[in-house]
Amino acid sequence: MSGWPRIYYKLLNLPLSILVKSKSIPAEPAQELGLDTSRPIMYVLPYNSKADLLTLRAQCLAHDLPDPLEPLEIDGALLPRYVFIHGGPRVFTYYTPKEESVKLFHDYLDLHRSNPALDVQMVPVSVMFGRAPGREKGEDNPPLRMLNGVQKFFAISWLGRDSFVRFSPSVSLRRMADEHGTDKIIAQKLARVARMHFARQRLAAVGPRLPARQDLFNKLLASKAIARAVEDEARSKKISHEKAQQNAIALMEEIAANFSYEMIRLTDRILGFTWNRLYQGINVHNAERVRQLAHDGHEIVYVPCHRSHMDYLLLSYVLYHQGLVPPHIAAGINLNFWPAGPIFRRLGAFFIRRTFKGNKLYSTVFREYLGELFSRGYSVEYFVEGGRSRTGRLLDPKTGTLSMTIQAMLRGGTRPITLVPIYIGYEHVMEVGTYAKELRGATKEKESLPQMLKGLSKLRNLGQGYVNFGEPMPLMTYLNQHVPEWRESIDPIEAIRPAWLTPTVNSIAADLMVRINNAGAANAMNLCCTALLASRQRSLTREQLTEQLDCYLDLMRNVPYSTDSTVPAASAGELIAHALQMNKFEVEKDTIGDIIILPREQAVLMTYYRNNIAHMLIMPSLMAAIITQHRRISRDALQQHVEALYPMLKAELFLRWEREELASVIDALASEIQRQGLITLQDDELHINPTHSRTLQLLAAGARETLQRYAITFWLLSANPSINRSTLEKESRTVAQRLSVLHGINAPEFFDKAVFSSLVLTLRDEGYISDTGDAEPAETMKIYQMLADLITSDVRLTIESATQGE
């Protein structure tokens, strides 16, 4: 580029460099989209806009991609590196420029015909200033229409710092030429497909238009389901129809979001400023799969795990910066206090009560509102656990909202609904101290402005945040596979509850929890906490801690928990240095070196972070525990031990493997543990390697408390085969509390009611107990003997003496 064009673009770039601060999506386009910079690249933009072109250029230069203003020279022909699909609107509409895109596409395809070695990568790119979806019955949706020069000037002036450059996966023109030919008709088709691509992409970025709130309420009131519920309300409460209708409107006011793009923009600025000071980084993985779903027109339901109140803001912030529409979020009614409630409502929150029981009008209004969100095409987010995890483990799912999601599908007419499980991880959770108090029996504080301000005042260094998108679950595909007759239940008016609904919802919920855990994120804090809590003194020398982290990292890298889980790329030493900056640990120096200590008062709190990744390490920990206690064991015996205990572990930690997969998992882990030198293999027997016994013992400690808990329940069951389920749960907790006091077990989940409830249910499902109350004494005692061999003699004595003293 030379002469007048260069001067023109330099002059135009002066105001843009001041007004525009754009963001690239994805953050590293060449790496994430697999662009090969050694091969020719050309860019395709939706319409002729020099401002868009220069904004694209800035991002290309920042990411070491070819300059779009530099033409491509191919076989002596000089072609522009960018193509505008449409000439774009003009201030003076009587002038209509000639469309150039088809000619340029044809020129490029023609070069591929004459040069079989040529392969140009065509990269569609859209540049957006502002993301306002607009209102129904309003003017044309600004982000979805092309802007002329004057309109563009005002858009850039006002929205230049809320702009992004969205790179799409490249299209190989070589493949196009080979599969479809190179004539002009193919060039026209290419231009037409590109137009459709950009229209879909913009809809995915801004979402459908927003209704006027009153219009939405009027539509809901006119629905047959709510009209019938209003009549029932009037009849059952002996009130007038108008009063019952006012009750319905009051419930809509309580529930419905009041989405505001301006509030999203303002909050984005505030959060961007805040995150940069509180977090050292927010790590996002597998966002491209969600962008593709949105582009393909799926109705997306985000289903994250729930660690903290911060989840609401963090996930919306991440989605917004991934070029996606922030979802409508189901938030607990406890958050509907001033000023948080009105703010959350404008950020897309709709509020849900803890229970729907006994209020048919409320459940009908909520279900119809949720169905309306789906039918209008808004993305939705809800926490399937129902509340924040106090232990750091996933809670058993609450299936009410999930059930309503499937019922919305049974109304017909919605786009394909896809559930997207999300793992959210932190190196510091601001509520973790409160969680520990609640687990010890303290009453949960009601959310309020003073409590919120108190929490905000404590925010300091929060380390790294992690948002990992798991494997999506298309509901239609799932139902087609598991309930082929589901379409027979479609009813556009009534909320249908076919016989298959409850078991199917339970199965989907369990699958979602497994997929959330599959996307787990190991980090410096949860790895260091796992190692230090494994030591009975909660302290290790720096060398021992480094060695233990190397063990965990090698296990996770060489035998990954799943393809969606993430492990830090940093070395053990770097992770320890980072964790020490979080001020959770103490370092004592002596003449030999550093000792890293987890203070007693911090130990209970740090179990939360250990539990975040307990599922990722439980299998190697269990194997290490079995090998450590037996000193030597055959592969077959090891597998028998693991298979006997696995159903309880799978239910408790939502593990991913089926029973038939265990043999290959055990083999892979045994090979890795042997490679690390922790064990040796002699005559198909696994032996402890005495020179690395400490590392193996610390690895085994990850399963120690779980095995002790199982031993308690199996001992009680074998001692009293006719014990009923509720008594078994209660007595197991009592013994666990005694054990935690006598043996210094600091984990709050050790005697958590939900953990024992889940365990007893699994024992019923596995046939150890039945609803008639009779256990299988021989089988129960066999498992207890196996567990008794895996726990220390003093713990075993405490468990067995607990029942003898009664």
Swiss-Prot record:
Protein's recorded name: Glycerol-3-phosphate acyltransferase
The reaction(s) this protein catalyses: sn-glycerol 3-phosphate + an acyl-CoA = a 1-acyl-sn-glycero-3-phosphate + CoA
Compartments, record wording: Cell inner membrane
Name of the gene: plsB
Cellular component, GO annotation: plasma membrane
PANTHER family assigned to the protein according to its UniProt record, in alphabetical order: DIHYDROXYACETONE PHOSPHATE ACYLTRANSFERASE, GLYCEROL-3-PHOSPHATE ACYLTRANSFERASE
Membrane topology (UniProt): Peripheral membrane protein
Broad EC category: transferase
